[in-house]
Amino acid sequence: MKRISIKEVEKILEEKRNLIKVDLRFADLHGAYLHKNFCGADLRFADLSRADLRGAILSCADLRFADLRGADLRNTGLNLTDLRFTDLRGANLSGTELNLADLRFADLRGTILPETKTVGANFLFSARD
C-alpha cells in the first residue's frame, strides 16, 4: 500500500470541511495540525506522531497500528475507537474521551492520562508504566 503524503492530505483537507469516513490508511501525517472531524475514518498504519489533534473527533475511527507517539490528543473524542496495537508512547491524552475504546495491545508507556474518561474501554494486554 502506498503511503499518502502530507501534500495529498492537505489537498483532501482543502476539499472537505470534515473527514468523516475518509480513507487515510498509511498516511504520513507526522506533526500535522488536524483539528477536524475524523468520525469513522480509516487511519490504520497512519503516522500521526507528534500530530496536534487537540479537540478532534475520532470516534468510531480505525487507528489500528497507527503511530501516535508524542501526539497531542487533549480533549479529543475517541469513543468507540479501535486503537489496537497503536503506539501512544508519550502522547498527551488529558481530558480525552476513550469510552468503549479498544486499546488491546496498545503501547501506553509515558502517556499523560489525567481526567481521561475510560468507561468500558478495553486495555487488555496494553503496555503501561
Please annotate each region the language model reported.
Residues 1-129:
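Tandem repeat scaffolds
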